[in-house]
């Protein structure tokens, strides 16, 4: 059975000192590097949040405060600080991530009108990143998932991977949550278990 590792958004803006810092986000990088080197994956996919300056998920572009939730083109949208803007240092992969192991990179969030948490689709399922077809073309049956952040991009990548017919394993030691609310990480894990995701340490 062929397997792939999906490494979600290990980028400067989500790590220490970044504009949308996930607490201790950079501390999972050694774990991820170890997986990439030792687990004999057939494919290793890196995803990269890759926003234009005018992206509508940015609070400043809507006159809103960070953390507010608005209706954006028919979809509930959390307002975020400006992050992972194309051409800025924040969009780059964290320097400690051994990205030389990657076989494929998926860029997401490029449409300014729709956010894109999942590595497979945007939040309205209008844009397909091509990841599912790529994995299926390589005869991948199992996907293991790590990265940032557990309660957003990792969560929706896991859910979409299940819906696309893959066996999905989340490495809990390879992810961290934003935790806009204190129980978000715990609630996300319970939700993923209910969706059929296996969660391992």
Model-derived regions: residue spans:
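Extreme N-terminal starter segment of soluble prokaryotic enzymes
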Residues: 1-5
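Active-site flanking residues adjacent to catalytic metal/cofactor-binding acidic residues
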Residues: 8, 48, 172
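Short glycine-enriched, charge-decorated loop/helix-capping segments at active-site entrances
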Residues: 18-25, 119-123
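Short catalytic helix/loop segments, enriched in acidic residues and glycine
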Residues: 22-37
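Active-site alpha/beta core segments
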Residues: 34-142
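Histidine-anchored nucleotide/phosphate-binding helix
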Residues: 35, 154-165
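Structural recognition of alpha->loop->beta junctions
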Residues: 78-81, 95-104, 182-201
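A short glycine-rich beta-strand->turn/loop micro-motif centered on a GG-aromatic cluster
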Residues: 144-147, 167-179
């Amino acid at each position: 059975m062929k397997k792939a590792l999906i490494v979600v958004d290990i980028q400067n803006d989500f790590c220490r000192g970044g504009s949308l810092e996930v607490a201790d986000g950079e501390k999972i990088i050694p774990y991820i590097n170890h997986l990439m080197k030792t687990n004999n994956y057939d494919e290793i996919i890196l995803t990269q949040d890759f926003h234009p300056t005018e992206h509508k998920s940015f609070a400043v572009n809507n006159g809103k405060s960070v953390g507010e939730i608005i209706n954006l083109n028919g979809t509930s949208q959390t307002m975020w600080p400006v992050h992972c803007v194309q051409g800025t240092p924040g969009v780059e992969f964290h320097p400690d991530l051994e990205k030389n192991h990657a076989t494929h990179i998926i860029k997401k969030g490029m449409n300014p009108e729709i956010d894109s948490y999942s590595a497979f689709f945007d939040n309205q399922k209008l844009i397909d990143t091509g990841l599912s077809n790529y994995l299926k073309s390589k005869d991948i049956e199992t996907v293991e998932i790590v990265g940032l952040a557990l309660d957003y991009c990792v969560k929706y990548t896991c859910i979409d991977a299940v819906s696309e017919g893959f066996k999905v394993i989340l490495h809990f030691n390879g992810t961290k949550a934003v935790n806009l609310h204190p129980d978000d990480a715990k609630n996300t894990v319970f939700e993923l278990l209910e969706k059929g995701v296996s969660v391992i340490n």
